[in-house]
Amino acid sequence: MSTTRPSQSSNNSGRSRNSARIIAQTTVDAKLHATFEESGSSFDYSSWVRVSGSVDGDQQPRSNKVTTAYLNHIQRGKQIQPFGCLLALDEKTCKVVAYSENAPEMLTMVSHAVPSVGDHPALGIGTDIRTVFTAPSASALQKALGFAEVSLLNPILVHCKTSGKPFYAIIHRVTGSLIIDFEPVKPYEVPMTAAGALQSYKLAAKAITRLQSLASGSMERLCDTMVQEVFELTGYDRVMAYKFHEDDHGEVIAEIAKPGLEPYLGLHYPATDIPQAARFLFMKNKVRMIVDCNAKHVKVLQDEKLPFDLTLCGSTLRAPHSCHLQYMANMDSIASLVMAVVVNDSDEDGDSADAVLPQKKKRLWGLVVCHNTTPRFVPFPLRYACEFLAQVFAIHVNKEIELEYQILEKNILRTQTLLCDMLMRDAPLGIVSQSPNIMDLVKCDGAALFYRNKLWLLGATPTEYQIREIALWMSEYHTDSTGLSTDSLLDAGFPGALSLSDTVCGMAAVRITSKDIVFWFRSHTAAEIRWGGAKHEPGEQDDGRKMHPRSSFKAFLEVVKARSVPWKDFEMDAIHSLQLILRNASKDTDIIDLNTKAINTRLNDLKIEGMQELEAVTSEMVRLIETATVPILAVDVDGTVNGWNIKIAELTGLPVGEAIGKHLLTLVEDSSTDIVKKMLNLALQGEEEKNVQFEIKTHGDQVEFGPISLIVNACASRDLRENVVGVCFVAQDITAQKTVMDKFTRIEGDYKAIVQNPNQLIPPIFGTDEFGWCCEWNAAMIKLTGWKREEVMDKMLLGEVFGTQMSCCRLKNQEAFVNFGIVLNKAMTGLETEKVAFGFFSRKGKYVECLLSVSKKIDAEGLVTGVFCFLQLASPELQQALHIQRLSEQTALKRLKVLTYMKRQIRNPLAGIVFSSKMLEGTDLETEQKQIVNTSSQCQRQLSKILDDSDLDGIIDGYLDLEMAEFTLHEVLVTSLSQVMNRSNTKGIRIANDVAEHIAKESLYGDSLRLQQVLADFLLISINSTPNGGQVVIASSLTKEQLGKSVHLVNLELSITHGGSGVPEAALNQMFGNNVLESEEGISLHISRKLLKLMNGDVRYLKEAGKSSFILSVELAAAHKLKG
């Protein structure tokens, strides 16, 4: 099927097309920049965008020189903004290799008006930077030179030697040198003395807390909250959330502005408004500030001996380019602050627990943009806080995107339902004449069916004449494809596209036959876009030549008036599925009559119910509770204890008999009553809290030891209708560790006696000082992580010790890093922190999962001097006992098992149906046709039977009713063989049927459908295990045994012999129930063996030199004797 827009059917091809689109868009950006520079004040923005809008993602304009010059200009600009100054140093010598023209004045000039000779040292190429700053400042900069992740130290507070003025030194490394941005510390600021993350968090703490408290499920609410918090945090006149769409154009999706400013909410911008090169820079530098777009830029002078031009891409002072400055001026914006929102690329796989695998690929989802009508400077600590806030925001955006994908999956299931419903109709007319119809399949404005030279129209469509013209055009120019999808008929080359543009411009069309076509139509994108901003007053006009948001919006509308919303991959999958159904139906609707109502019912409403399952779960829960070596208790819906295992009875001194029947709240300490009450109420509502700490009373001889401290996970117990009928609490006894921690946190002097104590009761402990440096790492941490104390001490805890790249203990992803930072910072500010789940990779690559507790460290005066972190590892006993929490999830797991089984089993009969249909097309013999139709019918019956198998446990445990009927082995063989013929033909494997004729024609009595299911399954496994060009041989033997006067018992044995190395050992182990059922083959073989056992049979697998055999045995009855 041809398409004028690349679909993303695979990750690799999707990414390659995405790269091609970015390259093409970068070329367009370069042309725009070059034209702007050449045209000056005569540049007509709207006209240029309309012309460039026709460039598609799969077309690359040949402008390599222009593009190269543009990218070099963007990346190698030699100017900075004047609010600070810049030095570039040689890493080995600390000498200046480049400096901004304002650096000598800012860094060496004394404060009095008339400087005298000797007031300040000379600053230029070759100057040793240590002569410019005070000794402590020079020492700090010297230390940074040898630091691998130098950005973790930002900002470094330095003081000039001559004037004593404080500056923030913001350092980053480029090839061959260190670049340092110096930003003056304003008189009203309290200088930041610690590295960024720890101190900046305090500024954004309120905003982060509010974002984390939001309920999921609304991207709009999330974005509105973000812009509100940034508005309050930074004080800019306008804050917007800006989202990039799939075609790279942007949209303002949230906004807050001071009164009197024109709103931009709802505006869409062409992709060129934020060039690809700028987006790349946003991925590298997450925050970008322009203080005054009217300020004169400062040149950067570099040593002529340098073999390359320095890049200032990573500089916080980098000057904006003229094109962007003009844009800001046209929208009356003098200053701006932009934060990048970077999320996981949806094309990538999920996070891996493997330490050697790379991190997830990222993409720029959008920007948080702040504008001000007057110059505005935001100090680095506040910008760092904004970057931290943007990272938290990005995590929540990621979660909302994942939620949207889940909704998308539900839509796919809905589509399956529609497809199956349409399949039951009078195809193909039922898809337009009944409800639901083809317009319900995918989002569209209209649809049409062109069938046997007649047209049926639905919704907004072209005229009948125009549709016939489209069909004729497709037959002439798209003869080799099965259809066409495009978001622009104009771009696709349809001659009459302009006459259609007011009604439709996007189309998806598929052929049922060479002459019959189904169409879906979409109107242009502009019809769906609404601007939420102020309307024009009468007589007011825009100057479309200027680069302005309103002009951008109009230019965007001009571009998209001939383009619809692109067709999504899942929508095209649904369309293709319907196409296949209709094409098959058009061949012979009487032959292929799939029972899709059963498919729909089973796939979309699959439930595993039954008293046997409930009894199994109940007995398992009772066994686990009674024998677990960790404390476990359970209550009913009223909070009355109905479960109390031996371990908790030992800890509390309260026997099981006395505990049963008491209310849980009477058994816990008064200080824990509210905590337990909340936990219990939430669990009864289905919300299961994890890692909750409370204390429970002791009784009898245990009273003298005090209350027991527990870490508890709640697990709601449910009945078959998913109603909560009680709560089970799985706990870990942490009394000993808590005693140690309490003593630890109460000590006012020397902590080392406890931290460095080798006692096994001491948990893993590490700590940081108030500046973020790792200052504690006890013996338990060494054992747990594999990193020695001297290897981590005096490293930055956030980034060097625990981080996502080049760190000692690698965290799984950026989200884990940000959340770890939040917990540390909360404790540093004196706030109480709860235990949180924490995980990292040890030195050997093992992933460690634990609970993290963080406590502030205080000195004798009560000042916070750092934090201590305690890790609690789940004991093996707790890990074993946590199995009980997964009991409530068994239904979902069994559904997955059933779906895996069904997926496997459905393939065989469907393949048989397809094969039978192909055979029917090539024969005129009435007898053979009847045989093929009969085979197809048997396959369909088998399919229906499999779809009824929702209770796998019933089959495994032998609780399945067999449907007895008369049949011949010949019928079973023919039907089973039809299901594997496609596979055998593909591999060139010959199937030899050595079953004797008298056995094949023997009238038998039993469940023929189950027998053919089993036989087809073992045949397919044998074919898959046979080398290409090999042979599979079927043979049989039959013996009869008389039971009474009228019944003969038939012992049927079938052998399936194949060449090659044989069936994999793992699959055979699963067949015999020796291993967990993991693979499709293993599940299928296991079920087939259980079906044979239901028929008083079994299976053996024999291996000889060069060949192997399945030996199937089954007990049946001789049908002719039963008749008499």
UniProtKB/Swiss-Prot annotation:
Signal peptide: none
Molecular function via GO: phosphorelay sensor kinase activity; photoreceptor activity; protein homodimerization activity
Domain GAF residues, every copy: 218-401
Assigned keywords, A-Z: Chromophore, Photoreceptor protein, Receptor, Repeat, Sensory transduction, Transcription, Transcription regulation
UniProt modification remark: Contains one covalently linked phytochromobilin chromophore.
UniProt cross-references to SMART domains, sorted A to Z: GAF, HATPase_c, HisKA, PAS
Ranges of residues in domain PAS: 617-687, 750-821
Domain Histidine kinase per the UniProt entry, residue ranges: 901-1120
Region (Disordered): 1-21
Oligomer and partners: Homodimer.
Function: Regulatory photoreceptor which exists in two forms that are reversibly interconvertible by light: the Pr form that absorbs maximally in the red region of the spectrum and the Pfr form that absorbs maximally in the far-red region. Photoconversion of Pr to Pfr induces an array of morphogenic responses, whereas reconversion of Pfr to Pr cancels the induction of those responses. Pfr controls the expression of a number of nuclear genes including those encoding the small subunit of ribulose-bisphosphate carboxylase, chlorophyll A/B binding protein, protochlorophyllide reductase, rRNA, etc.
Protein family membership: Belongs to the phytochrome family.
Protein name as catalogued: Phytochrome type A
Organism: Lathyrus sativus
Underlying gene: PHYA
